[in-house]
Amino acid sequence: HEIAQALDVTVSWFFQEGTQAKPGEAGLIVRKSTRKKFDFHGTGVHEEMLSPSLSGQILLIESTFAPGTGTGDRGRKRQGEEAGLVLSGVLELHLEGEKFILQEGDSFALPREGSHRCFNSSSEPAVVLWISTPAAY
Protein backbone atom coordinates (compact mmCIF):
# COMPACT_ATOMS: atom_id res chain seq x y z
CA HIS A 1 0.00 0.00 0.00
CA GLU A 2 2.84 2.40 0.80
CA ILE A 3 4.48 1.92 -2.62
CA ALA A 4 1.16 2.52 -4.37
CA GLN A 5 0.63 5.71 -2.35
CA ALA A 6 4.14 6.92 -3.16
CA LEU A 7 3.52 6.35 -6.88
CA ASP A 8 0.00 7.82 -6.67
CA VAL A 9 -1.61 4.66 -8.06
CA THR A 10 -3.93 2.05 -6.58
CA VAL A 11 -2.47 -1.28 -5.48
CA SER A 12 -4.53 -2.94 -8.21
CA TRP A 13 -2.27 -1.21 -10.75
CA PHE A 14 0.41 -3.76 -9.75
CA PHE A 15 -1.78 -6.83 -10.26
CA GLN A 16 -0.49 -9.35 -12.75
CA GLU A 17 -2.93 -10.04 -15.53
CA GLY A 18 -4.52 -13.47 -15.64
CA THR A 19 -5.31 -15.08 -18.97
CA GLN A 20 -7.76 -13.32 -21.27
CA ALA A 21 -11.51 -13.63 -20.55
CA LYS A 22 -13.68 -15.55 -22.99
CA PRO A 23 -15.81 -13.52 -25.41
CA GLY A 24 -18.95 -12.28 -23.66
CA GLU A 25 -17.48 -12.81 -20.16
CA ALA A 26 -15.25 -9.72 -19.89
CA GLY A 27 -16.51 -7.47 -17.09
CA LEU A 28 -19.04 -10.09 -15.95
CA ILE A 29 -17.38 -13.40 -15.11
CA VAL A 30 -14.02 -14.16 -13.50
CA ARG A 31 -12.81 -17.70 -14.08
CA LYS A 32 -10.27 -19.05 -11.62
CA SER A 33 -7.66 -19.17 -14.40
CA THR A 34 -8.25 -15.50 -15.32
CA ARG A 35 -7.96 -13.96 -11.85
CA LYS A 36 -5.58 -11.04 -11.43
CA LYS A 37 -2.97 -12.05 -8.88
CA PHE A 38 -0.76 -10.15 -6.50
CA ASP A 39 1.99 -11.83 -4.52
CA PHE A 40 3.49 -9.76 -1.71
CA HIS A 41 6.95 -11.31 -2.20
CA GLY A 42 8.63 -12.32 1.02
CA THR A 43 5.53 -11.73 3.15
CA GLY A 44 3.68 -15.01 2.68
CA VAL A 45 0.52 -13.14 1.63
CA HIS A 46 -1.03 -13.82 -1.77
CA GLU A 47 -4.16 -12.11 -3.12
CA GLU A 48 -6.43 -12.71 -6.10
CA MET A 49 -9.00 -10.27 -7.41
CA LEU A 50 -12.39 -11.97 -7.77
CA SER A 51 -14.25 -8.91 -9.08
CA PRO A 52 -14.44 -8.58 -12.87
CA SER A 53 -13.35 -4.93 -12.69
CA LEU A 54 -12.73 -2.00 -10.38
CA SER A 55 -15.35 0.14 -12.10
CA GLY A 56 -18.21 -1.07 -9.90
CA GLN A 57 -19.00 -0.28 -6.28
CA ILE A 58 -18.00 -3.64 -4.75
CA LEU A 59 -14.59 -5.33 -4.66
CA LEU A 60 -14.04 -9.02 -3.91
CA ILE A 61 -10.53 -10.21 -3.00
CA GLU A 62 -9.34 -13.63 -1.85
CA SER A 63 -6.33 -13.41 0.47
CA THR A 64 -4.19 -16.38 1.47
CA PHE A 65 -2.01 -15.94 4.55
CA ALA A 66 0.75 -18.54 4.92
CA PRO A 67 1.35 -19.80 8.47
CA GLY A 68 3.01 -17.12 10.60
CA THR A 69 2.23 -14.24 8.22
CA GLY A 70 -0.07 -11.24 8.29
CA THR A 71 -0.66 -7.66 7.24
CA GLY A 72 2.09 -6.24 9.46
CA ASP A 73 2.20 -4.30 12.69
CA ARG A 74 0.99 -0.94 11.36
CA GLY A 75 -2.44 -2.07 10.25
CA ARG A 76 -4.43 -1.19 7.16
CA LYS A 77 -6.70 1.83 6.93
CA ARG A 78 -10.04 1.49 5.19
CA GLN A 79 -11.42 3.82 2.54
CA GLY A 80 -15.00 2.62 2.97
CA GLU A 81 -16.88 -0.39 4.27
CA GLU A 82 -15.16 -3.76 4.47
CA ALA A 83 -16.25 -7.23 5.54
CA GLY A 84 -14.86 -10.73 5.25
CA LEU A 85 -15.43 -14.45 5.53
CA VAL A 86 -12.81 -16.96 6.64
CA LEU A 87 -12.96 -19.66 3.96
CA SER A 88 -10.37 -21.91 5.62
CA GLY A 89 -7.85 -21.85 8.43
CA VAL A 90 -7.66 -19.54 11.44
CA LEU A 91 -7.22 -15.77 11.34
CA GLU A 92 -6.40 -13.34 14.14
CA LEU A 93 -8.19 -10.06 13.49
CA HIS A 94 -6.90 -7.07 15.47
CA LEU A 95 -9.29 -4.11 15.74
CA GLU A 96 -8.72 -1.05 17.89
CA GLY A 97 -6.62 -2.95 20.44
CA GLU A 98 -8.83 -6.06 20.56
CA LYS A 99 -7.91 -9.48 19.15
CA PHE A 100 -10.53 -11.78 17.66
CA ILE A 101 -9.79 -15.40 16.68
CA LEU A 102 -11.81 -16.30 13.59
CA GLN A 103 -12.18 -19.81 12.20
CA GLU A 104 -13.52 -21.31 8.99
CA GLY A 105 -17.04 -20.04 8.36
CA ASP A 106 -16.72 -17.00 10.66
CA SER A 107 -17.47 -13.61 9.10
CA PHE A 108 -16.84 -10.04 10.18
CA ALA A 109 -17.66 -6.43 9.35
CA LEU A 110 -15.12 -3.70 10.00
CA PRO A 111 -16.02 -0.24 11.27
CA ARG A 112 -15.88 2.48 8.63
CA GLU A 113 -13.13 4.37 10.45
CA GLY A 114 -9.91 3.05 11.96
CA SER A 115 -7.48 0.37 10.97
CA HIS A 116 -7.12 -3.37 11.32
CA ARG A 117 -4.40 -6.03 11.28
CA CYS A 118 -4.61 -9.71 10.41
CA PHE A 119 -2.30 -12.54 11.37
CA ASN A 120 -2.25 -16.29 10.80
CA SER A 121 -0.79 -17.88 13.93
CA SER A 122 -1.79 -21.41 12.91
CA SER A 123 0.23 -24.08 11.09
CA GLU A 124 -2.12 -24.09 8.07
CA PRO A 125 -2.81 -21.40 5.46
CA ALA A 126 -5.72 -19.04 6.21
CA VAL A 127 -7.90 -18.04 3.25
CA VAL A 128 -10.19 -15.01 3.58
CA LEU A 129 -12.78 -13.55 1.21
CA TRP A 130 -12.80 -9.73 1.51
CA ILE A 131 -15.73 -7.61 0.37
CA SER A 132 -15.26 -3.85 0.26
CA THR A 133 -17.02 -0.78 -1.04
CA PRO A 134 -16.18 1.41 -2.80
CA ALA A 135 -14.12 -0.79 -5.11
CA ALA A 136 -10.74 0.78 -4.34
CA TYR A 137 -7.64 -1.33 -3.77
For the regions a protein language model found, what residue spans apply to each?
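Hydrophobic micro-packing sites on short alpha-helices
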Residues: 1-7, 11-15
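A short glycine-rich, His/Asp/Glu-containing loop-to-beta-strand
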Residues: 32-74, 130-132, 136
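Short acidic-glycine-tyrosine-enriched beta hairpin
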Residues: 50, 96-113
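Glycine- and acidic-residue-biased ligand/ion/polar-headgroup-sensing regions
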Residues: 78-96
